[in-house]
């Protein structure tokens, strides 16, 4: 982990990938418009939403490694480490990234609200998976915000517009996150129900007389899950 890119401001990453610097506290990058880039293991001093269709494989996020699904979002916050060490190869990525400095939020109600967006946490073990409609809406918002940054000088009025767009994007992400949690809760409930039925049938059939207490291995095989 010697070659870590320290993203102390949004424009550090913009310079790294060769994208225009649009604002000192916000960066919006359309990966499709920049040359193929090198991967980097990043130490984040900013908030970020990586909204992509083809993430590099074996990404690091905290102490974990994972492969992101197609059309998904990875959210990062200051103090986190994530990405992938430079492999020496140029890769082409399709999608967008929104980076914004905590300084932009100082003194705003959004600053206090950030703790409610739990998808920024290392404990969020999955990326946010978008359907085509969500992909279209979120990327359209980023495109519109980028246009605002390109056409207007920094001012209190522009910062209010920036915060409005960012809040809307974050709320879309929150809705996706809550949907995934609901789906995961339903899946967990279904597994538990199947497990209880399995144990009930096991004892009703008298299998304990020949096989003893059902083992983790046995239950996993019957439920088609790994015992680990």
Q: Each predicted region: which residue ranges?
A:
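Generic protein-terminus/edge-of-domain signal
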Residues: 1-68, 72
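Key DNA-contact positions within bacterial/archaeal DNA-binding proteins
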Residues: 228
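Conserved metal-binding segment of the jelly-roll/cupin
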Residues: 68-82, 99-102
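Compact structured core domains
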Residues: 133-182
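A hydrophobic/aromatic-rich effector-binding and dimerization subdomain
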Residues: 87-152
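Short beta-strand His + acidic residue motifs that chelate non-heme Fe in jelly-roll/DSBH
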Residues: 58-60, 82-90
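A short, Lys/Arg-enriched amphipathic alpha-helix from helix-turn-helix/homeodomain DNA-binding modules
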Residues: 163, 185-225
């Amino acid at each position: 982990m010697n070659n870590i890119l320290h993203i102390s401001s949004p424009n550090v990453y913009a310079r790294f990938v060769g994208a225009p610097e649009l604002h000192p506290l916000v960066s919006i990058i359309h990966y499709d418009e920049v040359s193929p880039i090198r991967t980097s293991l990043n130490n984040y001093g900013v908030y970020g939403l990586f909204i992509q269709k083809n993430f590099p494989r074996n990404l690091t996020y905290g102490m974990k490694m994972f492969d992101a699904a197609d059309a998904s979002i990875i959210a990062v916050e200051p103090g986190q480490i994530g990405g992938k060490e430079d492999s020496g190869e140029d890769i082409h990525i399709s999608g967008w990234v929104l980076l914004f400095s905590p300084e932009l939020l100082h003194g705003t109600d959004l600053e206090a609200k950030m703790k409610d967006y739990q998808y920024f946490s290392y404990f969020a073990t999955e990326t946010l998976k978008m359907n085509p409609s969500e992909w279209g809406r979120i990327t359209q918002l980023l495109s519109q915000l980028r246009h605002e940054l390109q056409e207007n000088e920094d001012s209190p009025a522009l910062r209010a517009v920036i915060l409005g767009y960012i809040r809307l994007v974050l709320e879309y992400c929150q809705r996706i996150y809550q949907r995934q949690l609901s789906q995961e809760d339903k899946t967990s409930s279904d597994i538990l129900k199947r497990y209880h039925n399995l144990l009930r049938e096991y004892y009703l059939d008298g299998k304990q007389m020949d096989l003893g207490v059902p083992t983790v291995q046995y239950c996993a095989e019957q439920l088609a899950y790994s015992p680990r």
